[in-house]
């Protein structure tokens, strides 16, 4: 499904919800912009470059503060006097009366002004509306156009730290789109402050355009060789799935500033993936699902595999492995010594195809035969639904010296149809760590393969099916730690996430075949599953965790022996931080994402005795905008349901009046391991609803979500939707009792998993608490979703048929008890298939249910962008909600035809 960890207010996220995944794939309101001066991977997705215009909404807010306005009707101020010769006594009485009335009015206004001021101050003090949103009550209302077009997006830079050829730390790769210095260069972080000499800088590409045989090319992405002598350049990139793309590839020589095709025999060939050897002497790449090798000392290209094609992938993932396992376009891994290449061979010949039909466009690029242009373009995707055959994956190795492909069998492994390979990490001396999951993702086998000797052994087994009945999370955060006897590390080892006392923590396994870790972290809090940074010289590990609160993220350090846990960020204040460390761990790009206006700076780490600090970004434009707009207050609090403490955020309109009654909109995602309630700065659709429409918006992260411990997270296994819906309903009941809430106007909405949860909540509640709902791209039956994701949380349909029946949206009578609900879906959704919505409509038809609306977006995928569709989604959500909260649907249902 599409995920999002919420990044600047995304409305939907992939079902593959892991915090280390890029959130920028398809974010409905994520409008991050990145300055080209500091960059990482090039973005080949141009979704957010689209300009979105605002739909006109009613000028007046139906819930403005009418109750504090003076009446202006038939009174003394407007009534004409009947006798112009009134005596002075009468006038004096009127004057005194007016003065008293005026004094009373003034006192009333001052009282409420002071009360509201005290309320705002209390919110700021208690809940940290140190959140920038909540600090302004006066100004212009937000516009939907401004929210959608990126005006409120924070500027955020990514630094691509690189290792110097001679081990220098603090080197970064920079791209300058304006080419004021050079298009692509490597320089020391100190050179930005003129603190270094020229030898610590390399100009890699002087210009962003380069010519080959008289044809000018523009880079889509660039990867310098480790020795900085060449640059691998992708041009003419065309997106495939969420992360993958194809392009023409070129080898750019730094000395001569000239380029040649990666494969001289096929310069126009579309390549899926290419990567440098650690020694900079070769490139391995995949084309047409076969693996090739180009050594730089020759123009010859060697074909390593020959079985690749429609059903077999070598070195790149198929759809489900890209979406649900690796979150990237690569399943190719060079050994550290450059002698071997490990790659995944994926055979999906037994995986059924699912057709995606395009009615308005032709993504295939193929012109139909004459007379057939009225038929849709059809793309068939190998998509394993729950219970269907999975692709069969095997780990293969290529021996560079002997030009041989082989595999290593480790006894006791899972059968072909019961095996997922989720992580491959090279160690030293030709050894590699491999994680294998069973199909239902509740048993992990970690094996250590000695590639030169072609042997392997089982080093760890994590059996969650027996331990707590939960699932194993897919991560790519295992970090190899090389031996250094002189520095207290006699053996190789690795850092990995482990479960300790019901929470995710870091463990250090040394030697690599040791199954008992050194515990690096512990306690009733959890670490973020992004790869930790390691300062090998000082045996220090840096990581991000939610130690202070589930809604916060801070950066910490700990020694490899598990001692001296220290915060790197200010934990005395609510904060949400991210960090990117230099290769040697001496510098860090610290990114503060909220609750105040985001900023970024590069600093030295505590082990680096050379003080350094440079502010990279302050988002001054956001600070200026905040002063001009009336933003909602965000009140963070907890709610306890069934003895489980859950995180809640309530967004109140800027001119909130506690004596009024406000409609309430619940927004949720709610997928396993996800998180929507956090302290990031965000001005999104929810902000617009509170600021401009004047409604309260509430989000609760229910059971099943992230950073609340495994007991509360894994309780949802086998019956997705039940506990999550219960938490939404119980929270809504609590809000319905609040004196400022209009309990007859409570709605819920979500996208993707949030769409499923919207329908499941409406079904389970049956109109008792919620009256309205809006579901976008929802799953309606988990048998329709992909196997790897679904079976992780639901087991297989064969093992859990009852759970699948219960989790499906099936009680149409219950849905009929709601006043009205809305369902929207893109017809070309390759993630959550349109089949889900069609199945729901069929059930509604058979039950004779009519209290719903449907909007379909032709040729739109899960993000719903095609042909202005994204704007239309939010226009429809907004106008539909206004109609609901002004009783438009109830009035419409009561209209009878004239006879």
From Swiss-Prot:
Record-level GO BP terms = proteolysis
Cytoplasmic side of membrane: 1-91
* Chain intervals with Low complexity compositional bias: 22-37
Membrane-side (Vacuolar) residue stretches = 113-899
- Do the record's keywords include Protease? yes
In which broad location class does this protein mainly occur, judging by the first location in its UniProt entry?
Answer: membrane
Q: Which InterPro entries match?
A: AB_hydrolase_fold, Peptidase_S9_cat, Peptidase_S9B_N, Serine_Prot_S9B/DPPIV
The listed locations are:
Vacuole membrane
Q: Which UniProt keywords apply?
A: Aminopeptidase, Glycoprotein, Hydrolase, Membrane, Protease, Serine protease, Signal-anchor, Transmembrane, Transmembrane helix, Vacuole
Active site residues of this protein: 752 (charge relay system), 829 (charge relay system), 862 (charge relay system)
Topological relation to the membrane, as annotated:
Single-pass type II membrane protein
The answer to whether the entry has keyword DNA-binding is no
EC number of the protein: 3.4.14.5
Membrane-spanning segments: 92-112
- Extract the PANTHER family matched here: DIPEPTIDYL PEPTIDASE 10, ISOFORM B, PROTEASE FAMILY S9B,C DIPEPTIDYL-PEPTIDASE IV-RELATED
UniProt function note: Type IV dipeptidyl-peptidase which removes N-terminal dipeptides sequentially from polypeptides having unsubstituted N-termini provided that the penultimate residue is proline.
Q: Which family does it belong to?
A: Belongs to the peptidase S9B family.
What is the name of this protein? Probable dipeptidyl-aminopeptidase B
Q: What is the lineage of its organism?
A: Eukaryota, Fungi, Dikarya, Ascomycota, Pezizomycotina
């Amino acid at each position: 499904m599409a995920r999002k960890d919420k990044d600047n207010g995304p409305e939907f996220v992939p079902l593959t919800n892991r915090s280390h995944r890029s959130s920028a794939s398809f974010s409905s309101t994520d409008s991050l912009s990145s300055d080209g001066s500091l960059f990482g991977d090039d973005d080949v997705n141009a979704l957010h470059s689209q300009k979105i215009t605002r739909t006109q909404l009613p000028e007046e807010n139906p819930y403005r503060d009418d109750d504090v306005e003076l009446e202006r009707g038939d009174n003394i101020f407007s009534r004409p006097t009947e006798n112009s010769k009134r005596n002075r006594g009468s006038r004096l009485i009127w004057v005194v009366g007016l003065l008293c009335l005026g004094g009373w009015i003034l006192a009333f206004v001052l009282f409420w002004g002071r009360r509201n001021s005290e309320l705002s101050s209390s919110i700021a003090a208690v809940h940290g509306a140190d959140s920038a949103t909540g600090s302004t009550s006066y100004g212009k209302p937000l516009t939907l156009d401004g929210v959608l077009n990126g005006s409120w997006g924070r500027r955020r830079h990514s630094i691509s730290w690189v290792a110097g050829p001679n081990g220098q730390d603090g080197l970064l790769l920079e791209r300058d789109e304006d080419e004021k210095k050079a298009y692509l260069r490597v320089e020391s972080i100190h050179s930005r402050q003129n603190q270094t000499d020229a030898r610590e800088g390399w100009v890699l590409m002087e210009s962003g355009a380069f010519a080959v045989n008289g044809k000018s090319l523009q880079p889509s992405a660039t990867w310098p060789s480790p020795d900085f002598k060449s640059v691998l350049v992708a041009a003419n990139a065309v997106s495939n799935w969420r992360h993958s793309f194809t392009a023409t590839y070129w080898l750019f020589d730094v000395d001569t500033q000239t380029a040649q095709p990666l494969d001289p025999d096929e310069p126009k060939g579309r390549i899926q993936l290419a990567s440098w050897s650690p020694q900079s002497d070769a490139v391995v790449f995949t084309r047409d699902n076969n693996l090739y090798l180009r050594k730089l000392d020759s123009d010859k290209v060697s074909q390593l595999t020959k079985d690749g094609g429609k059903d077999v992938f070598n070195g790149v993932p198929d759809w489900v492995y890209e979406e649900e396992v690796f979150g990237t376009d690569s399943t190719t891994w060079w050994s550290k010594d450059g002698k071997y290449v490990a790659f995944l061979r994926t055979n999906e010949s037994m995986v059924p195809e699912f057709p995606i039909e395009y009615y308005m466009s032709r993504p295939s690029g193929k012109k139909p035969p004459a007379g057939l242009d009225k038929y849709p373009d059809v793309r068939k995707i190998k998509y394993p639904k729950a219970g269907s055959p999975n692709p069969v994956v095997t780990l293969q190795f290529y021996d560079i010296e002997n030009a041989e492909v082989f595999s290593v069998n480790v006894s006791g492994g899972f059968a072909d149809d019961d095996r997922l390979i989720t992580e491959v990490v090279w160690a030293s001396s030709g050894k590699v760590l491999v994680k294998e999951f069973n199909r239902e993702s509740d048993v992990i086998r970690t094996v250590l393969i000695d590639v030169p000797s072609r042997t392997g052994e089982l080093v760890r087994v994590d059996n969650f099916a027996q331990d707590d009945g939960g699932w194993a999370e897919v991560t790519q955060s295992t970090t190899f730690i090389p031996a250094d006897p002189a520095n207290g590390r006699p053996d190789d080892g690795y850092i990995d996430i482990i479960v300790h006392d019901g929470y995710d923590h870091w463990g250090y396994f040394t030697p690599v075949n040791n199954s008992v870790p050194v515990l690096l972290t512990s306690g009733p809090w959890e670490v973020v599953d992004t790869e930790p940074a390691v300062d090998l010289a000082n045996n220090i590990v840096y990581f991000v965790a939610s130690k202070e609160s589930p809604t916060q993220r801070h950066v910490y350090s700990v020694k490899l022996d598990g001692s001296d846990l220290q915060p790197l960020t200010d934990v005395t204040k609510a904060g949400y931080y991210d960090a990117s460390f230099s290769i040697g761990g001496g510098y860090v790009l610290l990114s503060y994402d909220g609750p105040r206006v985001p900023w970024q700076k590069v600093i030295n780490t505590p082990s680096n005795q050379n003080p350094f600090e440079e502010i990279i970004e302050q988002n001054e434009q956001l600070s200026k905008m905040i002063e001009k707009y009336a933003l909602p207050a965000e009140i963070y609090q907890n709610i306890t349901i069934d003895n489980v403490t859950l995180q809640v955020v309530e967004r109140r309109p800027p001119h909130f009046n506690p004596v009024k009654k406000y409609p309430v909109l619940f927004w949720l995602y709610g997928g396993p391991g996800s998180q929507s309630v956090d302290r990031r700065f965000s001005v999104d659709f929810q902000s617009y609803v509170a600021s401009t429409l004047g409604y309260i918006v509430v989000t609760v992260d229910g059971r099943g979500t992230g950073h609340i411990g495994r007991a509360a997270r894994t309780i949802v296994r086998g019956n997705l939707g039940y506990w999550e819906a219960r938490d939404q309903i119980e929270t809504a009941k609590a809000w319905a009792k609040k004196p400022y809430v209009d309990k007859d106007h409570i709605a819920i909405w979500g996208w993707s998993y949030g769409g499923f949860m919207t329908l499941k909540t409406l079904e389970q509640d049956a109109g008792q608490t919620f009256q309205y709902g809006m579901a976008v791209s929802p799953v309606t039956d988990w048998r329709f979703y992909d196997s790897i994701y679904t079976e992780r949380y639901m087991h297989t349909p064969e093992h859990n048929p009852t759970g699948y029946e219960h989790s499906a949206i099936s009680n149409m009578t219950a849905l009929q008890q709601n006043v009205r609900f809305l369902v929207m879906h893109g017809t070309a959704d390759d993630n959550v298939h349109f089949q889900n919505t069609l199945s729901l409509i069929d059930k509604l038809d058979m039950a004779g249910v009519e209290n719903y609306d449907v909007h379909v977006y032709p040729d739109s995928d899960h993000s719903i962008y095609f042909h202005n569709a994204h704007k239309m989604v939010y226009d429809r959500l907004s106008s539909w909600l206004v109609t609901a909260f002004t009783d438009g649907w109830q009035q419409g249902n009561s209209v009878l035809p004239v006879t």
